[in-house]
């Protein structure tokens, strides 16, 4: 189905109407070297899970188990970027993107997670990187974005074993050697403070192990030790530090790139204005954000975690502390929403400890029956644009103003089977969301925060993990029924005009800064 001329006329006037109702913002509000891009991951985009020598990942296995994914779907095809990357790069170039953040599939490079290299995988990523650069787009490469080679999970338990530290370092070095002459931005691991509790506390992500009470009933292994999430996280941190050390010792001076870690970073507000609730905010920040950032800045875990967890939190020797400390050139921040935090036990099912039960903090999106922000198509994600400024300025103050890249930010809409294509394309709420977030981010930069980039999640609608294809974040609509055809949404129009300094791409933000 093609988008009609009438549809574009309607979208154009919708955008004009949006402008009239909403201080002016365009790319000129940001530093001249500020990097705008979109973000993706291998499992969510590539497809081709059994082609050209790729080995299975833990996500390949999980999605073929009944009841794991909301719509019983999988990433076997996803958006088929493995075959359609040139088409997608043309879309990126048409938008005027500076960079494209994608991840490398570990099991496409090393089908068994270690050992023999799959040269077809090397060739694919070489072709992708070269095509991006030929179109003026910088590759921003993540080494691990949730999809662990299944062979490593089966062999020794994946992130629960210290063996993974050397295997990750070896895999990272293969990538530095093969692609580093052209890749100037590396991320070691994406959102360990999310995939670790999802995989080892509540059992929704691989390897579906449950350490928390009332966790996922489909856990492969229930009643696991409550120390497991912290052990897995410890090995993630040491693997990260080992990869950074290898990059700095052998490649960084020659290749001239930078390397960092990407963290999930919601902001939190106290449910009530009381010392107890403000303490709850500090505590959830310790158990979420600071769990991974304190070690790479200060060389140890937050004191709050040490006091509450005792021997369940691994010790860090002075040697390991020195290796961890300063193991980043930038911090990647993935920010989507803001929630209320409270120490009060739940009175309604909306309150939850969920991923961080040891914090004894309950999170909610409501106070006295009023949402913290507009609801979105995904439960737990609310529109609170000022949160991006607050989390950035918190990181600035707490960690002495490190370089920050907003590695993901996006607006989810639910897939409604009754929605027409035209309704799906008219995503005015997504435009307002990004416009307002960028206004607050611009304010944070003006206040002195060293933010260098902003990546929209995502270029395309894609496979959204346990939600399957029921949630859409893309600037482009993807028809998953009819050959993954891409259709530009109104937000793609707006982002193109915003990036190309077109006056019609300027928006008026409802924010008051």
Swiss-Prot record:
<dbReference type="GO" id="GO:0042802">
    <property type="term" value="F:identical protein binding"/>
</dbReference>
<feature type="binding site">
    <location>
        <begin position="190"/>
        <end position="191"/>
    </location>
    <ligand>
        <name>a beta-D-glucoside</name>
    </ligand>
</feature>
<dbReference type="Pfam" id="PF00232">
    <property type="entry name" value="Glyco_hydro_1"/>
</dbReference>
<feature type="binding site">
    <location>
        <begin position="464"/>
        <end position="465"/>
    </location>
    <ligand>
        <name>a beta-D-glucoside</name>
    </ligand>
</feature>
<keyword id="KW-0326">Glycosidase</keyword>
<dbReference type="GO" id="GO:0005975">
    <property type="term" value="P:carbohydrate metabolic process"/>
</dbReference>
<keyword id="KW-0732">Signal</keyword>
<feature type="disulfide bond">
    <location>
        <begin position="210"/>
        <end position="219"/>
    </location>
</feature>
<comment type="similarity">
    <text>Belongs to the glycosyl hydrolase 1 family.</text>
</comment>
<feature type="active site" description="Nucleophile">
    <location>
        <position position="408"/>
    </location>
</feature>
<feature type="signal peptide">
    <location>
        <begin position="1"/>
        <end position="23"/>
    </location>
</feature>
<feature type="glycosylation site" description="N-linked (GlcNAc...) asparagine">
    <location>
        <position position="223"/>
    </location>
</feature>
<dbReference type="GO" id="GO:0009809">
    <property type="term" value="P:lignin biosynthetic process"/>
</dbReference>
<feature type="binding site">
    <location>
        <position position="44"/>
    </location>
    <ligand>
        <name>a beta-D-glucoside</name>
    </ligand>
</feature>
<comment type="function">
    <text>Involved in the release of monolignols for lignin biosynthesis. Unable to hydrolyze 4-nitrophenyl beta-cellobioside or alpha-linked methylumbelliferyl glucoside.</text>
</comment>
<feature type="binding site">
    <location>
        <position position="408"/>
    </location>
    <ligand>
        <name>a beta-D-glucoside</name>
    </ligand>
</feature>
<dbReference type="InterPro" id="IPR017853">
    <property type="entry name" value="Glycoside_hydrolase_SF"/>
</dbReference>
<comment type="subunit">
    <text>Homodimer.</text>
</comment>
<feature type="binding site">
    <location>
        <position position="145"/>
    </location>
    <ligand>
        <name>a beta-D-glucoside</name>
    </ligand>
</feature>
<dbReference type="GO" id="GO:0047782">
    <property type="term" value="F:coniferin beta-glucosidase activity"/>
</dbReference>
<feature type="binding site">
    <location>
        <position position="457"/>
    </location>
    <ligand>
        <name>a beta-D-glucoside</name>
    </ligand>
</feature>
<dbReference type="InterPro" id="IPR001360">
    <property type="entry name" value="Glyco_hydro_1"/>
</dbReference>
<feature type="glycosylation site" description="N-linked (GlcNAc...) asparagine">
    <location>
        <position position="447"/>
    </location>
</feature>
<keyword id="KW-0438">Lignin biosynthesis</keyword>
<dbReference type="InterPro" id="IPR033132">
    <property type="entry name" value="Glyco_hydro_1_N_CS"/>
</dbReference>
<feature type="active site" description="Proton donor">
    <location>
        <position position="191"/>
    </location>
</feature>
<protein>
    <recommendedName>
        <fullName>Coniferin beta-glucosidase</fullName>
        <ecNumber>3.2.1.126</ecNumber>
    </recommendedName>
</protein>
<feature type="binding site">
    <location>
        <position position="336"/>
    </location>
    <ligand>
        <name>a beta-D-glucoside</name>
    </ligand>
</feature>
<keyword id="KW-0378">Hydrolase</keyword>
<feature type="binding site">
    <location>
        <position position="473"/>
    </location>
    <ligand>
        <name>a beta-D-glucoside</name>
    </ligand>
</feature>
<keyword id="KW-0325">Glycoprotein</keyword>
<keyword id="KW-1015">Disulfide bond</keyword>
